[in-house]
Amino acid sequence: MTYDTTLPYPRDLIGHGRHPPHARWPGGARIAVQFVLNYEEGGENCVLHGDAGSEQFLSEMFNPASYPERHMSMEGIYEYGARAGVWRILREFEQRGLPLTVFGVATALQRHPEVCAAFTELGHEIACHGLKWIHYQNVPEDVERAHLQEAMAIIERLTGTRALGWYTGRDSPRTRRLVADFGGFAYDSDYYGDDLPFWMQVRRTDGSVVPQLIVPYTLDCNDMRF
């Protein structure tokens, strides 16, 4: 199946239809699982980061408002993940010998060199999760493009290798095209609409069309829902 975003109606509501293919995973495996850790702590909306207000999208607080000043409770919630939570998760995966993919927000990784080094030392993949953990829906295209480029440069500088996976999470209608413009990604996970990986035809800004492997993100398994 190829999802063609270049058609006049760019959404594909049909997919594999009634007869999805057998994935034929290596070694006869019945299922492929990608364990993902979203590392966003220190990349969220915060006036200290130059943002207009505090984070409100994702936290243990119910329906929090965004304030145009520091929100100390919200900051503390995010700091827990960086100070304690991430180390607990890394220990559990190390004990079990399981690999992780870290969807790392570049500025969050930059603010915690120790945890970034641990991800690398433990052999976990670091995929790019954007420069900042913000909504990009209304961010101007030139700014979003600059953020993408800066994020990739930061991760390469911190880890010594370029990120091969991409996931924004709070993307815009322009994100996939900008990712295709940058190029070189093994996969893009900014999609929730399927169980199986597939190829997507994406039109770049220069008009050329390129195939991009999509590895869908199973948002219903994200523990933020619980």
Which residues does each predicted region cover?
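A conserved mid-domain beta-alpha-beta active-site/ligand-binding segment of alpha/beta enzyme cores
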Residues: P211-F226
